[in-house]
Amino acid sequence: MKVLKRDSMLLLITLYFLLTTSMARQDPFLVGVEKDVVPAGTDLKQNKAKPHLPNLFRTMRRVPTGPNPLHHISPPQPGSLNYARN
């Protein structure tokens, strides 16, 4: 009986955690993408809005900055432990 109670409590806590963490996201399909509401017909460079048209979405992708570690990998050295042996 104690085992069933413990398992049910663990299941409830896990479900609660999963539900609350998924609700924290606005839209799980927009990872790395930001959307701004822009009136349709707007020149995005001059920000001239025409209010009689419906709103559109302008999507801006966030580009990661900084050094790419894959470009700075040195070739394996024969004396190292990870060197492939024949």
From Swiss-Prot:
Glycan-linked positions: P67
Superkingdom, taxonomy of origin: Eukaryota
Signal peptide residue numbers: 1-24
Stretches for region Disordered: 43-86
Alphabetized UniProt keyword annotations: Developmental protein, Differentiation, Glycoprotein, Hydroxylation, Secreted, Signal
UniProt key word Protein biosynthesis: no
TM ranges: none
Alphabetical GO biological process terms: cell-cell signaling involved in cell fate commitment; embryo development ending in seed dormancy; maintenance of root meristem identity; phloem development; positive regulation of gene expression; regulation of cell differentiation; regulation of endosperm development; regulation of seed growth
One Gene Ontology CC term in the entry: apoplast
Keyword Transferase: no
Gene Ontology terms, MF aspect: receptor serine/threonine kinase binding
Modification sites for Hydroxyproline: P64, P67
Similarity field: Belongs to the CLV3/ESR signal peptide family.
Protein's UniProt name: CLAVATA3/ESR (CLE)-related protein 8
Native organism: Arabidopsis thaliana
Annotated gene: CLE8
